[in-house]
Amino acid sequence: MKVVYTDDALRDLLDIADWLADHYPAVAPAVERRIRRLVARIARWPLVARRVVDRPDIRVAPLGHYPYKIFYRVRDDRIEILHIHHAARQPRTPEN
């Protein structure tokens, strides 16, 4: 299934990359690879991740042993990556 990133998700990726480059440059490539792999898995099996309790149209997939979560929505013909957040942060509310 086709994957599209919202502007918010693209900003999240840039923020994550910048922060990791400043604080943990050795880890940054591994996190980037893990994000790409998880997005590819979501594209293959879009319904496998759990739904967000108060937003059943949105799903959330954890990034394994890295503290990030990918929030996404499944549409008829595509998957929209809405946000990518550090698990300790309160996610923004995605717009409809």
For each feature predicted by the language model, list its residue ranges.
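Basic, Lys/Arg-enriched alpha-helical interface segments
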Residues: 2-60, 75-78, 94-96
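Enriched for short, Lys/Arg-rich terminal
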Residues: 63-69, 73-96
